[in-house]
């Protein structure tokens, strides 16, 4: 399970998930990527389940990069506890994902194999996702520069 080694504060505010992803919205390592279409908190267990689903399908052929990390602790109070008495203890860790964020990257396999591996990973995640390729992003980048 992914989690920070050391944190400055054990408990953080929940925050808002407004707007699009400005960082991490392009493919930087691999040839294919899995892009988020909705905002969500992705838990470390969900990230690990998606990673295992992809690596089991591609076997030893390709390489997988995880481009999100769960930095945010989510607290929870024990069951049947009265209100008050402070905030609960940290229960699990989440990564805040906005629309347009590339969460996973993959290379070293064919496109149809990568597409199927990403489809298996999508089923492990609580949001709608989109399969993207490096060529698609280069074409979009070229069109933007011409205008």
UniProtKB/Swiss-Prot annotation:
Keywords: Ribonucleoprotein, Ribosomal protein, RNA-binding, rRNA-binding, tRNA-binding
GO molecular function, one term: tRNA binding
Region (Disordered) location: 1-20
InterPro entries reported in the protein's UniProt record: Ribosomal_uL16 (IPR047873), Ribosomal_uL16_bact-type (IPR000114), Ribosomal_uL16_CS (IPR020798), Ribosomal_uL16_dom (IPR016180), Ribosomal_uL16_sf (IPR036920)
Gene3D superfamilies in the cross-refs: Ribosomal protein L10e/L16
PROSITE patterns named among the record's database cross-references: RIBOSOMAL_L16_1 (PS00586), RIBOSOMAL_L16_2 (PS00701)
BP GO annotations: translation
Any Pfam family matching the protein: Ribosomal_L16
One GO cellular component, as annotated: cytosolic large ribosomal subunit
Family: Belongs to the universal ribosomal protein uL16 family.
PANTHER family, A to Z: 50S/60S RIBOSOMAL PROTEIN L16 (PTHR12220), LARGE RIBOSOMAL SUBUNIT PROTEIN UL16M (PTHR12220:SF13)
Entry function: Binds 23S rRNA and is also seen to make contacts with the A and possibly P site tRNAs.
Quaternary structure and partners: Part of the 50S ribosomal subunit.
Name of the protein in question: Large ribosomal subunit protein uL16
The species this protein was found in: Alkaliphilus oremlandii (strain OhILAs)
